[in-house]
Amino acid sequence: MRLLLMHVDYIEYQVTKASKYAEDTEDSRKQARMEEALVAFVAAERGDETSIDDVAADAANAIGDVATKVATKRVVIYPYAHLSSELASPETALNILQEIESLLVGFEVLRAPFGWYKSFSLKCKGHPLAELSRSIHPEAKPEKKAVESEFYVLEPSGTITPATAFHSTDAEFKDIVSYELGQHALYSTEAELPHIKLMKEKELVEYEPLSDAGHLKWLPKGKLVRDLLIDYSYLLAVNYGAMPVETPVMYDLSSRAVSEHASKFGERQYRLKAGARDMMLRFAACFGMFSMMHQMHLTEKDLPLKLYELSTYSFRYEQRGELTGLKRQRAFTMPDMHTACRDMSEAKRFFIEQLRLGFKSGLDLDVKYQAIFRSTRAFYDDNKKWVEQIAREFKRPFLVELLSERVHYWVCKCDLAALDTSRKPIECPTVQIDVESAERFDIKYYTEAGERWPIILHTSPTGGIERVLCAILEAQALERVPALPVWLAPTQVRVVPVSEKHLQYAREVASEVRNAKIRVDIDDRDESVSKKVASAGKEWVPYVAVIGEKEEQRKSLAVTVRVSGQKESMSVNELIDHVRQEIEQMPYRPLTLPEMLSQRPKFV
């Protein structure tokens, strides 16, 4: 902020024309005169937007200090944009001016209308303090007392043990505990995580060199897998009763609610200018859904209100050195559900329900999740029986982190994490109890007793789509025969004709399989059968059906099942039944590549 301070015999002004940013003002302020006053010409700047209260307080102190020194009790606050070329948004500027006015207690204050063209005249006194300038900078706040955390292990029996004294027979849970206790260096490795090689080798996804670091491009197979994961998350939320919505990807930082919520993530944001407005690209779907909830007239009967959005792209400006394949990016896909609840009792009930969705996704995706429950110590002490109920419900130990005070919008959350091959967590599903955002975004519901702030649950039933695929690939990299879940495999059945004369029957088989909503292709290339089968193995195709002379005569197929290695003769219907049993009730999309491999381009 820039201030130009003048001690004057008088100042008088008259508004001439309203700009598009003009505030509504009473007639008495459109023309005014004040004598024996300190005039503060004020220009709010872009950097003020993240610390409106602090900047206004510092400005009021500076103005009051000079007014006291020149022995006047009269102050004129005069908006004056010409003091800076880096102006704050009009909304922020007006907020700051109004705040300064309210803070100048003990002074007679005249604030000239904001956003109006004005003519003015003044007579400046000639003493040494009659003309002064000040720059107000948002100061770094003193470091808060470090939040202390303690780790415990809560068992299904209700026994809680300091994490340092807990001995687990589950190697993966033990690794999660070690990581959270800061002992992960014992397991760290500088080697590239195997999913990075796999995502390229399997023609799923690659880095995009023409974009910013941490932005990916999805190849046809990867796009298909990603879309299926998106469909899965959508169905999980909708079948649970959530209503899908879609909201913008950028938000105005001059909104105090937006800037305060954004500040929770520090500097990890993409920011841009839209004309004179400072905007940010969202890092989650909170902003749009909270704005939607704010605009709704909610009554008690409307709750719980469940909204779901696939944030097709969320943005976090992670440090370049932290960017890792599918594990951490700057642009990612986040399924996001928010539930407005009547009170904490209802929020705790739906917390458990939504945590079930997270564990279900692990089963459906063939990913083993470990649970980390984080809470303030005060919340845990008040809700100990409920936390014990969670461990009992899911029949597993929970790593519990207790924080000495609340530093986020949540009082508790549960993260479900898989392990990568370096034995570090990949956090995927999460459920959080938010006690702050309803008030910040002015989200209310009405009861007979009056207005109330709802408690809001933040839930991602699967976690970020990229991380989900990362967890799947990292887990499969350790398997003797790696494979995607059959419902996610780009090609679920590959038909391999021994020679060209079997191609027509191969087409007939593929047609039947395709009509059963199974993704199928035909390896019609001029290669040996062994090479074709090996190629299918490299692509992790779960079912390979070879057709030779004997199979065509018998109208059968020589099928190899990838995971089991089992080889058996099947009819087309038997193959279809076998595959359908594995993909039943899971999302389906058709093959998006040429069905004939001879016509299929290579992307890697």
Stretch-by-stretch model annotation:
Residues M1-K30, M34-D54, I63-V66, V76-P90, ...:
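Auxiliary tRNA-acceptor-end handling modules of aminoacyl-tRNA synthetases
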Residues V75, Q98, R514-V579:
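C-terminal structured "cap/appendage" subdomains that terminate the fold
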Residues S102-L103, S361, Q389-F394, R507-V520:
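Short helix-loop-beta junction
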Residues W116-S119, M250-S254, G288, V407-Y409, ...:
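Short acidic loop-to-helix transition motifs that present clustered carboxylates
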Residues A276-D278, H294-M296, L305, E309, ...:
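A translation/RNA-centric and nucleic-acid-associated enzymatic feature enriched
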Residues K360-V431, K602-V604:
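Metal-assisted phosphate- and nucleotidyl-transfer catalytic regions
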Residues L363-W386, A483-Y505, S569-M570:
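Conserved, charged catalytic cores of large soluble enzymes
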Residues R480-K532:
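Generic long, charged, amphipathic alpha-helical segments
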